[in-house]
Curated annotation (Swiss-Prot):
One GO term (biological process): thiamine biosynthetic process
Keyword list, A-Z: ATP-binding, Kinase, Magnesium, Metal-binding, Nucleotide-binding, Thiamine biosynthesis, Transferase
Job description of the protein: Catalyzes the phosphorylation of the hydroxyl group of 4-methyl-5-beta-hydroxyethylthiazole (THZ).
Sequence positions that bind substrate: 39, 187
Catalyzed reactions: 5-(2-hydroxyethyl)-4-methylthiazole + ATP = 4-methyl-5-(2-phosphooxyethyl)-thiazole + ADP + H(+)
InterPro entries (alphabetical): Hyethyz_kinase, Ribokinase-like
Full protein name: Hydroxyethylthiazole kinase
Family to which the UniProt record says this protein belongs: Belongs to the Thz kinase family.
Domain of life: Bacteria
GO molecular function annotations of the record: ATP binding; hydroxyethylthiazole kinase activity; magnesium ion binding
EC number(s) given by UniProt: 2.7.1.50
Co-factor requirement: Mg(2+)
Lineage per the UniProt record: Bacteria, Bacillati, Bacillota, Bacilli, Bacillales
Length: 263
């Protein structure tokens, strides 16, 4: 857990432009791993914040016409500052409006990581793809989708699902940790985007090991939380997840991590 240990020591400032539903949970989750979250949204202060920040999360869960230009502006400011961006195109396939905005953002700014479920990532590379809400289609070939998205956007791809797929540096890994309860908590996936951002440390071309550790730390914490005798369901799972992120140690991490490199 080299990266998590570094986070706990250095408390990296992680800027989150995220959706209204998940701000509190995202901030608390970042605090739990040792990062320092800032939910700054004003383009007017972005230049100053981005001089000292370590990464920026952009999550479009509550995209509106009123915040479109702000998102484009902060993404471009992040590029100018050399700040890596984690982009979470929430429900991009659910509407033409979302898909058009995501395409515009990805043309207007360079992101370091695109994170979403298989349906969301597919929607970014296939104009005919649609989706229902934020649910991933379990029948999709996530590895193939991730590889195509990586080739299209020349950026790291993280696809979440029952198994997670990471493609970066022309390498692909499948990770098999996690808990079904993550799908029963609003904002769990959005928090993962923030966690990934917390692991970047101003690396606009992130090391695949950082991405693997970020996703594995989050999902192993979810496993441990779900197995806790006090976990009775989604309501108790959420605070237990935060507690487990806070307490997660190297021994538990190494004992539980399940990862396979794939062609």
């Amino acid at each position: 857990m080299n990266y998590l240990n570094k986070i706990r020591i250095e408390n990296p400032l992680t800027i989150c432009y995220t959706n209204d539903v998940v701000k509190n949970f995202t901030a608390n989750g970042l605090l739990s791993i040792g990062a320092s979250p800032a939910m700054s949204e004003a383009p007017e202060e972005a230049e100053e914040f981005y001089k000292v920040a370590q990464a920026l999360l952009i999550n479009i869960g509550t995209l509106t016409a009123e915040n479109e230009q702000d998102i484009i502006a902060i993404a471009q400011t992040a590029n100018e500052a050399g700040l890596p961006i984690v982009f979470d195109p929430v429900a991009v396939g659910a509407s033409t409006y979302r898909k058009q905005f995501c395409k515009l953002l990805l043309k207007s700014a360079k992101v370091s990581v695109i994170k979403g479920n298989a349906s969301e990532i597919l929607a970014l590379i296939d104009d005919t793809a649609t989706m229902k809400g934020t649910d991933s289609d379990a029948n999709l070939d996530a590895v193939a989708i991730a590889k195509k998205a990586y080739a299209t956007y020349k950026t790291a791809i993280v696809i979440t699902g029952k198994e997670d797929v990471i493609v970066q540096d022309n390498k692909a890994f499948v990770l098999a940790n996690g808990s079904p309860l993550l799908a029963r908590v609003t904002g769990a996936g959005c928090l993962l985007g923030g966690v990934i951002a917390g692991f970047l440390f101003r690396e606009t071309e992130p090391d695949i090991e950082a991405l693997i550790e970020a996703v594995s730390v989050f999902n192993i914490a979810a496993e441990v939380a779900a197995e806790n005798e006090n976990c009775g369901g989604p309501g108790t799972f959420s605070p237990l997840l935060l507690d487990t992120l806070y307490h997660l140690n190297e021994t538990t991490y190494q004992q539980r991590i399940r990862i396979q490199e794939v062609e």
